[in-house]
């Protein structure tokens, strides 16, 4: 789903992830993917909600030649499991998930 203020013509070309996987965090199993340049400047995309997840169009927001884009489905959202769960789903835990993902991917 596109933002009402962003026209498709203004986005970067579509790209496929060069890496995707899952990260186990207590009872949550988080889905993530990386796209763009493996040696590019890291950038993290956080999707909206509630319940929404990442979409292929989100990969188009960043220049794939300059950025290593990390996208992930937050707790209870998208391809993360359990879907729609609010158990152990707080802002503090989200911040912990982001830090764990950063370390898992070896990003300084």
Question: Where do the language-model regions lie?
Answer:
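Active-site loop/oxyanion-hole signature of alpha/beta-hydrolase fold enzymes
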Residues: 77-108
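Intrinsic disorder/low-complexity signal
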Residues: 7, 32-33, 96
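Conserved HGGG/HGGXW glycine-rich cap/lid loop of the alpha/beta-hydrolase fold
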Residues: 24-82
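N-terminal cap/lid segment of alpha/beta-hydrolase-fold proteins
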Residues: 8-29
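Residues at structural and domain junctions
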Residues: 9, 36, 84-87
């Amino acid at each position: 789903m596109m933002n009402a203020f962003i026209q498709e013509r203004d986005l970067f070309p579509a790209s496929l992830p060069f890496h995707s996987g899952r990260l186990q965090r207590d009872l949550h199993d988080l889905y993530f993917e990386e796209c763009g340049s493996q040696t590019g400047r890291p950038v993290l995309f956080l999707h909206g909600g509630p319940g929404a997840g990442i979409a292929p169009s989100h990969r188009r927001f960043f220049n794939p030649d300059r950025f290593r884009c990390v996208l992930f489905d937050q707790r209870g959202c998208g391809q993360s499991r359990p879907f729609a769960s609010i158990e152990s789903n707080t802002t503090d835990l989200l911040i912990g998930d982001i830090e764990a993902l950063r370390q898992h991917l070896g990003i300084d």
